[in-house]
């Protein structure tokens, strides 16, 4: 007689955790940090169409790492929920905390009830309205539904330890946009392979996806930073991306958020 397969609940949870962590670590890193005018998103992403960073609602942004199809379905669900609540009540009733809690509940349910967890990690960022005091909050939601709020920076995906170490050394509250972009990109470049080639790693402008949430904007705070503006920001801040031009005057074009 063949005995049925048995695994303890603890072993099943450990296996799920290991699977999710490995899936997230295979991706490229994303840095989300606060600066003097709001929130900055910087993702290492060579794709021009498959975004890791996007807008959820008027004052709320979204960043994710892991399996694209999984976090894209979560992003679309968050947009739908935000639009529905804003339509039924008031646009100011849509908050980052409510969306972060909804994501945490959804991910926790999948992790506990399904055989395979989502291999994703999410950051929901929110800024206040222009008339409010400067304030930004970052909600980090893990694959198992664990949620933590941060006030300075969040690092997700890839090899996070060297990036976190670099940010702890270089990040300061109240950085301007140019300095914040430089700090984030230099931290991402610190995540290269160990050994002699570690210091030689550079990330070109074409491999970066950058966006901001600006509290001073009247309604929709989210906007993307174009490649040209990003190149000027990096060159003006002295960051080596191997594609620089000597110019430091930067004006971000007004572009509709996606």
From Swiss-Prot:
It comes from the Bacteria. The gene is prcA. GO terms for biological process: modification-dependent protein catabolic process; proteasomal protein catabolic process. Belongs to the peptidase T1A family. It is found in: Cytoplasm. GO terms for cellular component: cytoplasm; proteasome core complex, alpha-subunit complex. Its main location: cytoplasm. HAMAP family: Proteasome_A_B (MF_00289_B). GO terms for molecular function: threonine-type endopeptidase activity. The 20S proteasome core is composed of 14 alpha and 14 beta subunits that assemble into four stacked heptameric rings, resulting in a barrel-shaped structure. The two inner rings, each composed of seven catalytic beta subunits, are sandwiched by two outer rings, each composed of seven alpha subunits. The catalytic chamber with the active sites is on the inside of the barrel. Has a gated structure, the ends of the cylinder being occluded by the N-termini of the alpha-subunits. Is capped by the proteasome-associated ATPase, ARC. Keywords: Cytoplasm, Proteasome. This is Proteasome subunit alpha. InterPro entries: Ntn_hydrolases_N, Proteasome_alpha-type, Proteasome_asu_bac, Proteasome_sua/b. Component of the proteasome core, a large protease complex with broad specificity involved in protein degradation. Pathway: Protein degradation; proteasomal Pup-dependent pathway. The formation of the proteasomal ATPase ARC-20S proteasome complex, likely via the docking of the C-termini of ARC into the intersubunit pockets in the alpha-rings, may trigger opening of the gate for substrate entry. Interconversion between the open-gate and close-gate conformations leads to a dynamic regulation of the 20S proteasome proteolysis activity.
């Amino acid at each position: 007689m063949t005995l049925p397969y048995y695994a303890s609940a603890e072993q099943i949870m450990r296996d799920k955790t290991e699977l999710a962590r490995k899936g997230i670590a295979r991706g490229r890193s994303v840095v989300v940090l606060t600066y003097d005018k709001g929130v900055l998103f910087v993702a290492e992403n060579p794709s021009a169409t498959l975004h890791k960073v996007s807008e959820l609602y008027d004052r709320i942004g979204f960043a994710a790492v892991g399996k694209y199809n999984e976090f894209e379905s979560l992003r679309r669900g968050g947009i739908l929920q935000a639009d529905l609540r804003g339509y039924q009540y008031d646009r100011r009733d849509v908050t980052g905390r409510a969306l972060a809690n909804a994501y945490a509940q959804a991910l926790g349910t999948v992790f506990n009830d399904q055989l395979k967890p989502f291999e994703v990690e999410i950051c929901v960022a929110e800024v206040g309205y222009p008339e409010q005091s400067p304030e930004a909050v970052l909600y980090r939601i893990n694959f198992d539904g664990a949620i933590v709020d941060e006030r300075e920076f969040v690092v997700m995906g890839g090899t996070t330890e060297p990036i976190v170490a670099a940010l702890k050394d270089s990040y300061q509250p109240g950085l301007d946009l140019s300095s914040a972009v430089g700090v984030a990109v230099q931290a991402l470049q610190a995540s290269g392979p160990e050994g002699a080639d570690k210091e030689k790693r550079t990330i070109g402008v074409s491999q970066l996806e950058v966006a901001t949430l600006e509290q001073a904007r009247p309604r929709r705070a989210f906007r993307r930073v174009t490649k040209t503006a990003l190149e000027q920001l990096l060159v003006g801040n002295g960051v080596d991306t191997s594609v620089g031009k000597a110019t430091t005057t930067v004006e971000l074009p007004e572009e509709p958020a996606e």
